Regions:
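Catalytic histidine-centered segment of alpha/beta-hydrolase-like enzymes
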Residues: 499-508
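Short alpha-helix in the alpha/beta-hydrolase fold that links the catalytic acid
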Residues: 457, 471-481
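Conserved acidic catalytic loop of the alpha/beta-hydrolase fold
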Residues: 208-226
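Alpha/beta-hydrolase fold catalytic core
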Residues: 323-469
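Catalytic histidine neighborhood in serine/cysteine hydrolases
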Residues: 483-500
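A catalytic-pocket lid/entrance helix-loop region that shapes and gates access to the active site
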Residues: 146-149, 244, 248-335
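Alpha/beta-hydrolase fold nucleophile elbow
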Residues: 223-235
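N-terminal cap/lid subdomain of alpha/beta-hydrolase-fold enzymes
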Residues: 39-60, 101-201, 480
Length: 521
């Protein structure tokens, strides 16, 4: 029985990142000021991405037919507790070219600049989500932007997509630039053909494109001297360190800090035959079970973290050939997660995420979320032997977030591209070239390198206790392998009671705001 299209899209993504009435902010309604058409699209060598040996059709006529409209700038003001923020928003795009100077893609970029700030001292932060295939709406409308959409546990697909002023906006202390990689948001190819897609829908092509967009924005806005930060969520944990490395070594741009939200840093620990994947997930699965009885903090999971590092791994390594060790492990995992002992023994205490989601509350026909295991939803096929369910913690957010992003862009920011807005584009993930080979994809190598290249670089890593897509303990295990000479006092890891989008919680969102602000002081 196949997954529904909606469930298939969500299940294929590694990120969560997600007709709205007129915004109820006190935005100052002004005439939009369009930028000169394609003013920044000169085909100089400095503005080219890595060479694409392309068979793409990239004629000027075709490029203009597919292109995004000129940039639009508007003025706004929002009243927040204890302060009012006046700012300038620009919605538009940056065009990318191949090594022949042929147009390849228009990358949608949304910028917010605080009015009256000195650009020499004012930080600027570039934000992107993951997927691959996710737009930046998750971070913009969920955590950092001047407006946000409530995405808490009460949200359902039909919830009104009404934005509100974001009291925890990062605009308090940094200008914001949200980037939608090609195929997400309104970003699109202006050339056709398989080669251009293969270039951008691949790890290295994606990294190169993101780095060039950031450099181009800095040049266009005369902000190369400003403090510069990057923030990425989920697969953004792969993008983030690699983009910083590209900026440092290929674009000639230094970066002051990197913020990683619920990141995946190393696929080796979360997939395939790696035994570490079971240790990485166990604390989050236990957190899901314990929160059913009351609030859970990371301190409450000290016992399971200790077990996951020690006896659990010892028994796991002994393998199923050691029946005593396997039974001992399975029974302990059953006690920690609440999964029936018979099921745990049948699976030898080795739960993958889908099995845990299905078995946790199977008697009542419910499944857990993947991005937030604490969110339970109905199993659409409880009578099936297979697992044919979506993600109750993410599926319900797609409609309201998409509608909110469209209305914000088209009505409030007055930028009106043709075509659909892609919040989560499953076709991007399906076509993505992860560069599979002997070495699975990871960014810890680049994390070490960027920390070594710049001894002043700061890194803030965050995660959610109930995140089953990017388990916090897996991140902890990766960070623990960093040499103290690189990580001490420079890499900070903060874990919140929440899921992948832990910032849906008011207290967590405020804490994230404060952590990022402290980092930029």
């Amino acid at each position: 029985m196949p997954l529904s299209p909606r469930s298939a899209v969500t299940a294929s993504m590694l990120i969560a990142a997600l007709a709205l009435p007129q915004l109820h902010s006190n935005a100052i309604a002004q005439e939009a000021r369009p930028a000169a058409p394609h003013a920044d699209r000169a085909k100089s060598a400095a503005e080219q991405t890595d060479t694409v040996a392309s068979k793409a059709e990239a004629s000027p006529a075709r490029a203009e037919l597919n292109s995004l409209p000129p940039d639009v700038t508007t003025k706004h003001s929002i009243a927040l507790p204890g302060r009012t923020l006046a700012f300038t928003a620009t919605a538009g795009s940056i065009r990318l070219y191949n090594g022949k100077g042929e147009p390849q893609a228009d990358i949608a970029v949304t910028t917010y600049k605080l009015d009256g700030a000195d650009p020499r001292n004012r930080p600027v932060t570039f934000l992107f989500n993951g997927g691959p295939g996710a737009s930046s709406a998750w971070l913009q409308l969920g955590a950092a932007g001047p407006w946000r959409l409530p995405i808490g546990s009460s949200v359902v697909a039909s919830s009104p997509p009404v934005l509100q002023a974001n009291a925890e906006t990062w605009l308090d202390f940094t200008d914001l630039v949200f980037i939608d990689p090609v195929g997400t948001g309104y970003s699109r190819f202006v050339a056709s053909g398989d080669e251009v897609r293969k270039h951008f829908y691949a790890v290295e092509g994606d990294i190169s494109a993101m780095a060039v967009v950031i450099r181009r924005w800095l040049e266009k806005n005369d902000r190369l001297a400003s403090p510069k930060y990057l923030a990425g969520e989920s697969y953004g944990g792969i993008r983030g360190p690699k983009v910083v490395d590209n900026l440092q070594t290929k674009q000639g741009v230094g970066v002051n800090g990197l913020i990683l939200v619920s990141p995946v840093l190393d696929f080796r620990d979360l997939s395939g035959s790696s035994l570490l994947q079971y240790a990485a997930r166990l604390p989050s699965m236990t957190a899901v079970a314990r929160q059913q009885k009351g609030k859970v903090t990371r301190a409450d999971l000290a016992d399971v973290e200790s077990y996951a590092r020690s006896e659990f791994l010892t028994d796991l390594v002994k393998g199923e050939a050691d029946k005593e060790a396997t039974t001992r492990l399975a029974d302990r995992v059953s006690a920690l997660t609440g999964i029936d002992k018979t099921v745990s023994r049948r699976l030898a205490g080795r739960f993958d995420t889908r099995e845990f989601q299905r078995e946790f509350d199977r008697d009542r026909g419910r499944v857990t979320g993947r991005f937030d295991g604490a969110k339970l939803g109905l199993d659409p096929f409880p009578d099936s032997s297979g697992s044919h369910f979506g993600d109750p913690s993410a599926d319900s957010l797609i409609a309201p977030l998409t509608s909110a992003a469209v209305q914000l862009t088209r009505s409030t920011l007055n930028w009106k591209p043709d075509g659909s807005y892609e919040l989560l584009n499953g076709s991007v993930a399906e076509q993505w070239d992860f560069g599979r080979g002997r070495q699975p994809l990871e960014s810890t190598t680049q994390l070490r390198e960027i920390l070594s290249v710049d001894p002043s670089l700061q890194v803030l890593v965050t995660g959610g206790l109930f995140d089953l897509a990017a388990p916090y303990f897996g991140t902890q295990m990766v960070l623990d392998q960093l040499p103290p000479t690189l990580a001490e006092k420079r890499v900070k890891f903060v874990v919140y009671p929440g899921g992948h989008m832990f910032y849906a919680d008011d207290a967590a969102r405020q804490s994230l705001h404060d952590e990022v602000k402290a980092m930029m002081k």
